[in-house]
Regions:
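C-terminal structural segment of proteins
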Residues: 1-268
């Protein structure tokens, strides 16, 4: 199928993009790796497409002593290749390198993936376990939202209709931090059936775990220290049940194993 006809605008900066997006039935375009197929299948039919890919602010990554801020249009490939700073000592590069295929990574963006909020995508779970902060711009100015408040459900976020995601700020891991991630896919490059992520950062007081690829937003275990110390089957299953996955025995077991393997990688 082909998309229905729409108007197209290429704004020069964030403020101009917000003016265009104030039009009724407009849609922002970042990498287009999710939006493109949705347009072709006519799942979405915007009257106006606003292309954000040429806004310099959204393509930049800035580093401070404590964090790295990634513009929304930083591509997966830029992270994979090390063309932008990695605050996680290689973890984000590994995540990016295992997203879909290189052609997708060349165009797909970290901000587009997060704003799309597909539970089976990698960045929602990975950024949740890292404790990222989402930077948002709208007609009323700019605001910041913690990622666990930003991701609200299945393809749902805290973004208002007239706002855009402009950046993601990721705190730097301390020297003693350990992070683990595991996903199950039917075949390489596909969206995940189950995701487990774990972060143990004692210098910052973090012992977090995330159960991803659920029926909604990633399920955050904000204090997972006891689970890290003793990741027994029943404790893992209870955690998975808390993510609303108790009804399907296969899915429940798959998520429990993904979480266990992510925790095991902390000691690797």
């Amino acid at each position: 199928m082909k998309s229905h006809a729409f108007d197209y605008q290429r704004p020069r900066d964030v403020e101009e993009s917000l003016r265009f997006l104030s039009n009724e039935n407009s849609k922002p375009l970042a990498g287009g790796q999710s939006l493109g197929p949705m347009l072709n299948l006519r799942i979405v039919q915007p009257a106006l497409l606003v292309d954000l890919r040429h806004i310099e602010e959204l393509k930049a990554a800035t580093e401070t002593k404590d964090s790295v801020t990634f513009g929304a249009c930083v591509t997966h490939a830029a992270i994979e290749d090390g063309r932008v700073p990695d605050p996680t000592r290689g973890f984000m590069r590994e995540i990016a390198a295992n997203i879909a295929y290189r052609a997708v990574r060349n165009r797909g963006t970290i901000g587009g993936s997060l704003a799309h909020a597909d539970p089976a995508a990698d960045w929602p779970s990975a950024l949740s376990v890292l404790g990222a902060t989402v930077l948002i711009a709208g007609p009323g100015g700019r605001r910041e939202v913690l990622i666990d408040k930003f991701l609200t459900g299945l393809f749902e976020t805290a973004l208002k209709a007239d706002e855009i995601l402009v950046a993601i700020r990721v705190p730097k891991l301390s020297a003693r931090a350990r992070v683990g991630y595991w996903k199950f896919c039917r075949k390489a490059g596909e969206f995940a059936q189950a995701i487990g992520a774990a972060l143990d950062d004692p210098d910052r007081g973090f012992a977090r775990a995330v159960i991803g690829a659920t029926r909604g937003a990633p399920h955050l275990l904000a204090d997972a220290a006891a689970l890290f110390a003793k990741p027994e089957k029943q404790a893992l299953l209870r955690a998975v049940d808390g993510a609303g996955l108790a009804a399907d025995a296969y899915n429940r077991q798959l998520h429990a194993v993904a979480l266990r393997r992510a925790i095991e990688k902390l000691a690797a």
